[in-house]
């Protein structure tokens, strides 16, 4: 079975940085998994997600997404980009546009070039966007402007836009970091349930262990650009968590559980 994402010996440094953001990272994610990247700020989680989304250049190693190897010097093909959806921490919505228009933006990679340029969605585009709005519980907000919404509503719009893209792999960067615990649980339930219903794989980042344990079948701990552990959620113990959030001292040996 082709992995949703496959990474081997990946290293990357941001231009001008004195230390690498990612160092010798290896990771495989099976189709249909819900996997959490767990770690403190600066661990490398956002960088890894951006790289899998095809937005970074100049890395070393092997990276394949949905069976297609990525080129460290070129953006991925348009068709492959359409298969990978991204939920941004800060939403990345068009504030003065309506909710429906923002969700339809998720269809741009599926539209013909002419429709994309003209902003003219097809009946299918409208149907898919409508289904995403319904699944995210915001069907009644379609004509509202985004700048009139609450933070929780905006995150639902961002997820609906991602779902409208019909991705096979969903990458979510700290999708609930700005929400209170109850809202955070609602949003992650929505995201993981919608992905499961569509047969999509989810890789999300978090710095909150309790959310990672609840919504991921597998947790990958990251610190200082390296993987500290990669374990099924039931096997993650308190010692591994303590090692992950220890600020000083050497990195512990990587604990791995093979993906089958």
Say what each PLM segment does:
Residues 170-173:
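Catalytic Walker B motif of ABC-type/P-loop ATPase nucleotide-binding domains
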Residues 166:
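Conserved catalytic motifs of ABC-family nucleotide-binding domains
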Residues 53:
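Helix-to-loop junction immediately C-terminal to a conserved catalytic motif
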Residues 145-149, 153:
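Conserved ABC ATPase signature
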Residues 38-40:
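The feature captures the beta-strand-to-loop junction immediately N-terminal to the Walker
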Residues 70-85, 115, 119-122:
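ABC ATPase NBD coupling module
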Residues 206-207:
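H-loop/switch region of ABC-family ATPase nucleotide-binding domains
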């Amino acid at each position: 079975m082709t992995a949703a994402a496959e990474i081997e010996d990946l290293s990357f440094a941001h231009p001008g940085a004195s230390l690498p953001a990612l160092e010798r990272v290896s990771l495989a994610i099976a189709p249909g998994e819900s996997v959490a990247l767990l770690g403190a700020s600066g661990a490398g989680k956002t960088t890894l997600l951006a790289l899998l989304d095809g937005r970074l250049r100049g890395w070393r190693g092997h990276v394949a997404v949905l069976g297609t190897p990525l080129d460290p010097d070129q953006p991925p093909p348009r068709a492959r980009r359409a298969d990978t959806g991204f939920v941004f921490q800060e939403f990345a919505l068009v504030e003065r546009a309506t909710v429906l228009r923002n969700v339809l933006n998720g269809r741009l990679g599926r539209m013909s070039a002419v429709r994309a340029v003209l902003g003219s969605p097809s009946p299918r585009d409208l149907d898919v966007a409508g289904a995403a709005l319904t699944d995210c519980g915001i069907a009644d907000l379609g004509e509202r402007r985004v700048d009139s919404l609450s933070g929780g509503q905006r995150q639902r719009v961002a997820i609906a836009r991602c779902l409208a893209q019909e991705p096979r792999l969903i990458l979510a960067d700290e999708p609930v970091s700005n929400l209170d615990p109850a809202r955070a649980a609602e949003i992650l339930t929505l995201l993981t349930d919608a992905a499961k219903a569509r047969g999509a794989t989810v890789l999300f980042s978090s710095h909150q262990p309790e959310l990672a344990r609840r919504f991921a079948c597998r947790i990958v701990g990251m610190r200082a650009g390296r993987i500290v552990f990669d374990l099924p959620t039931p096997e993650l113990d308190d010692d591994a968590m303590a090692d992950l959030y220890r600020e000083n001292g050497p990195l512990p040996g990587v604990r791995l559980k093979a993906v089958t």
